[in-house]
């Protein structure tokens, strides 16, 4: 049975929640400021995926998201450690786990930025030397950069999946 009321009412939702059953580490924070509840989605994200804040409403001791056409409830498990929203399941995590996920995702973004810069640099170097993009020389040069970073991503992802990893199109499949 899912319940949202009981001790603390809507305050039971406050904390960090990691989405389950997906191939990324999405962490949402539910917080209360000046009597209002907010959901800050994807606190480890950046760019278009950066944290987005949504106002939540309290209704009968549970939090709901107003969609403009109705309210969608956030449901809590009896123990308060699992939250359900639409088809998603979220597990409560502590601040240390959230910090670890955020730090890991920052490392992933940093590695991706380095890859993009080196990849673009190699491309420019080769095209400035008039190496055609359809030649084996070009493909091998680009694959060399991809191999270097594919290995680094593989090592980094031993500690957790990166939310975004570049597609390595020149590596042998």
Q: What are the roles of these predicted feature ranges?
A:
Residues 22-69, 148-151, 158-160, 166-170:
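N-terminal glycine/threonine-rich, aromatic-flanked beta-hairpin/loop signature
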Residues 6-8:
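Bacterial signal peptide processing site
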Residues 11-26:
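Tryptophan-anchored aromatic micro-motifs
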Residues 84-121, 147-171:
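Edge beta-strand at a domain terminus
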Residues 75-87:
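Short, exposed beta-strand-loop hairpins at the edges of beta-sheets
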């Amino acid at each position: 049975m899912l319940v949202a009321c009981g001790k603390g009412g809507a305050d039971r939702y406050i904390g960090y929640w990691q989405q389950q059953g997906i191939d990324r580490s999405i962490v949402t924070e539910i917080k209360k400021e000046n009597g209002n509840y907010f959901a800050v989605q994807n606190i480890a994200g950046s760019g278009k995926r950066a944290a987005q804040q949504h106002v939540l409403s309290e209704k009968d001791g549970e939090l709901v998201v107003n969609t403009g056409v109705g309210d969608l409830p956030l449901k809590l498990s009896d123990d308060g450690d699992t939250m359900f929203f639409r088809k998603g399941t979220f597990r409560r995590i502590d601040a240390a786990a959230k910090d670890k996920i955020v730090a890991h995702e920052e490392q992933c973004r940093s590695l991706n930025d380095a890859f993009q810069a080196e990849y673009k640099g190699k491309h420019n170097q080769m095209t400035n030397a008039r190496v055609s993009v359809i030649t084996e020389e070009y493909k091998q040069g680009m694959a060399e950069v991809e191999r270097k970073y594919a290995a680094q991503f593989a090592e980094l992802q031993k500690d957790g999946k990166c939310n975004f990893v570049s597609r390595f199109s020149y590596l042998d499949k």
